[in-house]
């Protein structure tokens, strides 16, 4: 859909404003230092006579390499540019090396550090705002304090029919303030501001966020790759006050974690929130901007639509904003339900986003044993015995494969690595079950009490693991309680969305069996 253009925009020009005139993009000279690649720190390259092996023990991974790949990845123990790699690996062109490195980046086996920028692009920072005058002022003040050339950035605040207007709260700040007399929503407000922006890059932030000083400098270098149209940074929480705030500090759906990743549907990072998003302006306008008919899920819709059209997106935790999360119980649960309600619409629009659910055989056999033992006593342990046999066979096979390629590891180290892999599979199964099926599973457990121990075990694995992994400032019991409340609210919203869209697609994932 085309970006919204509303005729009733009031302009309020501020000191330091460009007056809406387009600023010619500056020619970018060759970077002082090109992009550089390096192996993830948990990986090692083991060289052999016929090639080598890319080895990782956590998680367990062993990839066979030919001689060229072994030489190339061996060089990546230290950061190297494509030109440096081409000089050290005879017979591989820079294009072939780039394609190979790109495949490894997608699997999160490499780290890419972008080229150093010598000329910074013109950036327009867009803040849609409806009310929250004090928060909006704090947000703008953080942007004025950015470590970024003032003559290369423009700040637009889109006052979306705030009552009272935001002009008084922002009157002394050097920004452009645009006002809508009728509320059009965040998406339309962003689109309208984008059409009036002078920058070649649009930086979106919400008025309940505060940008850290190096926000733009941390993200913009990643646009050195012309195929990358969107970059998102990390969204962190302020110091927690209260249980919900402490929970949001570690479980917010806006925080994508501490690791760089390419953004694709069903990947570890599947979308980027608009409260911390940089987009090439020409790409946003070419693909219609944000869907103004959506009040929730518009960020996922825009990201997936742009990816579908051949562009790429990356998540980079280096560019951070601090987000003032909803911490009132009612607001928090309503927002989670709203997020859930958007899933049915998004999965209808984007079949490529169809959820995948892995079914690990060993985990399912163990759960089956827990369910059968109360009925059959000792004989109910049969599935657990089968699971142990499968694990032993897999362990023997892994040990044999490693020896075949010249890697000698003790049976204990391989067993621990393999055990972690299966524990991770159980965690992901549990996380899916808690998020989508906890209420119906508990109803089934109430009707058939013999199945309740297995159901409770399945549902408790994910919150237990997350409490240990995330280390929230909450007791285990409080964390588990909030975890359950959050996902009950999400499920209620999910079912509401399924009913509105007349589909069960979000509840019917694509199932993949795993060992």
Name these PLM-found stretches.
Residues 2-75:
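Acidic, low-complexity/disordered tracts enriched in E/D and polar residues
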Residues 58-60, 65-67, 72, 87-142:
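N-proximal low-complexity "stem/linker" segments adjacent to membrane-targeting elements
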Residues 141-152:
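Short, acidic, metal-binding catalytic loop of nucleotide-sugar glycosyltransferases
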Residues 156-167, 182, 209:
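A conserved acidic beta->alpha catalytic loop
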Residues 167-196, 228, 254:
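Conserved donor nucleotide-binding strand/loop of the catalytic core
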Residues 180-197, 207, 261-270, 275:
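Glycine-rich, basic loop-to-helix element that forms the pyrophosphate-binding segment
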Residues 202:
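Short aromatic/hydrophobic "clamp" motif used to bind/position activated sugar donors
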Residues 214-246, 324:
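Conserved donor NDP-sugar-binding/catalytic core segment of glycosyltransferases
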